[in-house]
């Protein structure tokens, strides 16, 4: 039967990509349906109980700046917060939170259920309704038909999911959940390039069977950081420590002697696993010279004894898993609550997507998350928000939007995926961005919230808080610029004594703050006045100290902007462009870049080829002008 009500956007999947997609679409006023096979697993953390980290927290903060849920749910569910790289520059500092799975999931569900324009329905999606290369809706497992202008697929590891533990395998989307077989078969019928990837998870341990006294304690930071720009430490539940132990020679011997029983090394698993989150057997094989590897013992929540041993993801047989765990210091008597496993699943080549994350071959069909070859909650959430927003824009007859590489890590992520594709699960790092000093986690709101407001993603509460912060920064910069200190005065002498820097002439406080040896907190201590909001103080200090570097990056961005924004015609025939080699014609034809800037980032496309493209575009433009004037 047909569902009696029509929607503008349908989102399939209730994981990190799906929830952000559905929320984004609904915030923009589109009537949105979130289809999930199980309402109880909305926002579930399928793998590690943590949000953020190097490169990843930048995505979380950008999701937050655009009104998303991930950071707010983390503040409500985070049981340990730390700032990584705190001794390094602001470009690479990253907030990481250990989360209580139950609290995090509950926070996500609360946000979903209180979002206007959003309906939730529990049914697996088995088929897409496609007419004349346009998606029209979805057919569920029981034959119920839903219709909409846009459909967002966020299927995670469920498409053709196959779980491996040793030589045994069985179909599953994740442990305890069925796979999506019918939808996977339907998608394989579409003219899209498909492949297989693999990810894995470690065995879970009962904390009552672990000896923490021989491990190294890793407490959270004090003062406790927050993840959301609207967050506060008062939202946080009680905080706990993580613990560190190590594998050893005995552990490595057990693994090495059982590699023939590993589905990875016996050819059973075809999918490629994540390079930057390898299984323990992969680590032992690839880094045979290392005597030990760190294992982070992470609590799964405040109301459970379950522990997540981060660093020993494995698909070895259970008897080997038990030997591995019990060979590690502090876990000699450990009880495994859930075995580790690997899961293999379908993904689709992201080069078949537009910047909006809409497929090039089926209008109105959007992909987000692991279906695009990424790994990680944060990468999924970022894509989900973008796909959901663009699905709503399409349904409303408006132009799509995607931030550029110099505007957001979301822009870096999408550009990498649709330009380069990926043959292994893609993870975000700060090193992937050319303009790291501009794309910091601390200024994500200053970069994106105004655009989010324009799109309809940002509500009144967030907008008011943002405007207050932005105004506070401007006022504090002006105060520092207009406050002067002279040598020989009480303040001048106090500054010289505090920082060991005698004043040679009159300075304003903004000039002084630009010196490497002078910090904002110290200036406030000496002068007795400063910003009350720590976010304002942080922005003023970073902007002042790194002004020269930031200006240089902005100049470089401005120079490149022209080619970045030059659109390539959808119908361009690369085989007809004189001077392009067959190889470059093939690469351009396979990727179908949307802009000249994107074309320049395709491996093997030379600067000379870009020049030829520019000449072709000029000739094409001149030719069309002549046709119009004739």
Curated annotation (Swiss-Prot):
Under InterPro entries, the record lists:
FAD/NAD-bd_sf (IPR036188), GIDA_C_N (IPR049312), MnmG (IPR004416), MnmG-rel (IPR002218), MnmG-rel_CS (IPR020595), MnmG_C (IPR026904), MnmG_C_subdom (IPR047001), MnmG_C_subdom_sf (IPR044920)
**Amino acids binding NAD(+):** 273-287
Q: Which residues form the signal peptide?
A: none
Q: Does the keyword NAD apply?
A: yes
One GO location term (cellular component): cytosol
Compartmental location: Cytoplasm
Q: Which UniProt keywords apply?
A: Cytoplasm, FAD, Flavoprotein, NAD, tRNA processing
Q: How does it assemble?
A: Homodimer. Heterotetramer of two MnmE and two MnmG subunits.
PROSITE patterns xrefs: GIDA_1, GIDA_2
According to its UniProt entry, the protein's GO biological process terms are: tRNA methylation; tRNA wobble uridine modification
What is the name of the protein in this document? tRNA uridine 5-carboxymethylaminomethyl modification enzyme MnmG
Q: Which organism is it from?
A: Pseudomonas fluorescens (strain ATCC BAA-477 / NRRL B-23932 / Pf-5)
